[in-house]
Every structure is written in C-alpha cells, then in structure tokens.
UniProtKB/Swiss-Prot annotation:
Pfam families: Toxin_12. It is found in: Secreted. This is U3-theraphotoxin-Hhn1h. It comes from Cyriopagopus hainanus (Chinese bird spider). Expressed by the venom gland.
Length: 87
C-alpha cells in the first residue's frame, strides 16, 4: 500500500513539473514574436524619419516622383505597379 501511494505521489509530482516546464517555455515563445515585431517597427520608424526623394506604393505623386518599380497613374495620380494593361 505504501509503494502505491509513493508511486502515485511521484507520478503527480512529475506531471506538475512537466506542466511548469511547458508553461515556462511557452511563455518565452510568446515573448519572442513580440520582441521581434517591436524591433522591426522600431527600425521602420527610424527609416520613416528620413526624407526621401521618391514616394512609394499608393502615395500621391503630383509633386514627387515615384520610387523605382512604380509608375505614376495618369488617372489617379498615385504611384502604382506597372502593368501591361495600364497606359
């Protein structure tokens, strides 16, 4: 009877330990994407502060030229991707 109680206690303690380890690793994994996104947006904000000579996709292109890879739409005056069906 004592051996059965001891084995049940050890099994229960092992399951609790497994739960704690899994929870800790999962919480670390949840923090990793948040850190990556914050670092990406921090870099992105720094690049937005620089003044550019061209404008990007779906930006108004009346005064400034579109960046490479885009053309100014004659109809909407926005920078768009060049396509064969556009004139």
């Amino acid at each position: 009877m004592v051996n059965m109680k001891a084995s049940m206690f050890l099994t229960f303690a092992g399951l609790v330990l497994l739960f704690v380890v899994c929870y800790a690793s999962e919480s670390e994994e949840k923090e990793f994407p948040k850190e990556m996104l914050s670092s990406i947006f921090a870099v992105d904000n720094d690049s937005k502060q620089e003044e550019r000579d061209c404008v990007g996709y779906m930006r108004e292109c009346k005064e400034k030229l579109c960046c490479s890879g885009y053309v100014c739409s004659s109809r909407w005056k926005w920078c768009v991707l060049p396509a064969p069906w556009r004139r």
